[in-house]
Amino acid sequence: RRQRQMCIRDSIQSIPSHKAEPFKRWLAEVGRERIEETIDPELTIDRALETYLKKGYSREWINQRLQAIQVRKELTDEWDARGVQKGVEYAILTDEISRAWSGMTTRQYKTLKGLTKENLRDNMTTLELVLNMLAEATTTEISKQKEPVTFSENIETARAGGKVAGDARKAIEAQTGVPVITSKNAAQLSQVVVDMIEGNVAPSGEDADS
């Protein structure tokens, strides 16, 4: 990491002074913000809120998204406590949870929404986010109670947590007659909100894929 920082510094120094100054000011500002966030974690939340608002998300959705971030953090903390390795093992368990509640792996889910490198959770509806949170929060709680030791036991725990949310999804769909999982991504969901505000579509959201 230190070597990378030195390379960045050398690259900046190689830029003519008058051209490098704006970039140096930007780096200083970013550094200041990170220090402030370390001192006051609430600033991280405030800045995340501001970023999502600028992207056109509703406050209701943003509240759920920020909560989802916290739920995910609690889950990964629990995985760390159980000796789960970051990277491949995290990805495997995440896929098990996703498959158990949505019927798809993370990659399949992203393909459905036409995503490549974009964050899947940033492209979920409020209900999708809530069910994903339920799956992850339940997995965390089951893990705390059962204290899995082996990776195989962690896989079973992930499947159990995901199944709880999967059952909830099926119950919701049975009551509404509408699939919870949608192919709409963030851009399409934002356009629906704009259309509703401008009166182009009915607030009830009659689109079969909504």
Annotate the PLM regions.
Residues 12-210:
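Positively charged, phosphate-engaging catalytic surfaces used for nucleic-acid and nucleotide handling
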